[in-house]
Curated annotation (Swiss-Prot):
Keywords: Cell wall biogenesis/degradation, Cytoplasm, Phosphopantetheine, Phosphoprotein. It comes from Staphylococcus xylosus. GO terms for molecular function: D-alanyl carrier activity. Carrier protein involved in the D-alanylation of lipoteichoic acid (LTA). The loading of thioester-linked D-alanine onto DltC is catalyzed by D-alanine--D-alanyl carrier protein ligase DltA. The DltC-carried D-alanyl group is further transferred to cell membrane phosphatidylglycerol (PG) by forming an ester bond, probably catalyzed by DltD. D-alanylation of LTA plays an important role in modulating the properties of the cell wall in Gram-positive bacteria, influencing the net charge of the cell wall. Belongs to the DltC family. This is D-alanyl carrier protein. The lineage of its organism: Bacteria, Bacillati, Bacillota, Bacilli, Bacillales.
Length: 78
């Protein structure tokens, strides 16, 4: 499976919302799709399933605002 698809699947799973795959430019926080608890869960899932460590200190809400932006950040980190 392609890395981008893995990330989108992970985001969809954590958010419990298919809009992520339908619109990868959706604003996750502005639209209320992600909250702080889901963000922490996402960071844990990224570490567990993708073997990429992201600390909460590295998390920047603007850089992680959309699924596409998250894919870009994670591609740089892996």
């Amino acid at each position: 499976m392609e890395f981008r698809e893995q990330v989108l699947d992970l985001l969809t799973e954590v958010a419990e919302n298919n809009v992520i795959k339908e619109n990868p430019d959706v604003e996750l926080f502005e639209e209320g799709i992600f909250d702080s608890f889901q963000t922490v869960g996402l960071l844990l899932e990224i570490q567990n399933k993708l073997d990429i460590e992201v600390s909460i200190m590295d998390f920047d809400r603007d850089e992680w605002a959309t699924p596409n932006k998250i894919v870009e950040v994670l591609e740089e980190l892996r």
